[in-house]
Amino acid sequence: MSIEDLSPGTKAAVLAEALPYIKRFHGKTIVVKYGGNAMTDEHLKSCFARDVVLLELVGFNIVVVHGGGPQIESLLARVGKKGEFIQGMRVTDAETMEVVEMVLGGQVNKDIVNLINQHGGKAVGLTGKDGNFIRAKKLMLEDKDNPGDLIDVGQVGEIVSIDPTLIDHLDKGAFIPVIAPIGVGKDGETYNINADVVAGKIAEVLKAEKLVLLTNTPGVLDKNGDLITGITPKQIDEMVDDGTLSGGMLPKIGSALDAARNGVKGVHIIDGRVEHALLLEILTDHGVGTMIKSH
């Protein structure tokens, strides 16, 4: 059932429930990492765009950071390359970096901007190379099997600094920044940065009220596959150690935890496969995922 199918009475109740949250978060910044099925399913894409526009219209400052894994994989396959991941990070040689920048900074970013604008928003597409607002350096991963050794994953970046000036100007003009996770090095080199990490760091720098990460799962799941609605750093460490959390969830969890520890008041990992998941998480009493607690 969609919102359009609800009875007038139920719709009124939903709006009444949302009012305190609209008052509470008016003028606040919410950073949204957009990825997963919500980016590939046409109906979910429309729901997401409408959610973003509505939240902006009622007075929230929305900043969107997006991924684009499936689209990158599709183009890599067309040029005869296969994606490789280590500890949730995409191994990025020079040719892969060209594909990543083409897909994220071109195709995906502009598609999202266009979709939001079609639904009445004023979205502006950016990469971290615009105004050099995301400065990065080469990331080397620790080899978990051989402590002390490092793994070279190519042109994968680690954030050095984020200049919020450009985003602040867009927010003040009621524009919605849509950011592709590409950074620039001190000598102009291009870096592919994990989108969850970029979203988390932007949330920290902007002193955002909330960071919301959309995923293809209900949230953080325990060993039995059951949803954990709230999780602490200690629990996260235990789940990483025993392998419950692994792969692509590692940078997501790490980013969420860092944001929670560095002043972002609400950090949520939610199910992007749910219609209007963003509205449900922000404007209702019961969210649709996992909240990361700072302690």
UniProtKB/Swiss-Prot annotation:
Pathway: Amino-acid biosynthesis; L-arginine biosynthesis; N(2)-acetyl-L-ornithine from L-glutamate: step 2/4. It is found in: Cytoplasm. Disulfide bonds: none annotated. Substrate binds at G68, G69, R90, N192. GO terms for molecular function: acetylglutamate kinase activity; ATP binding. GO terms for biological process: arginine biosynthetic process via ornithine; L-arginine biosynthetic process. It catalyses: N-acetyl-L-glutamate + ATP = N-acetyl-L-glutamyl 5-phosphate + ADP. This is Acetylglutamate kinase. It comes from Dechloromonas aromatica (strain RCB).
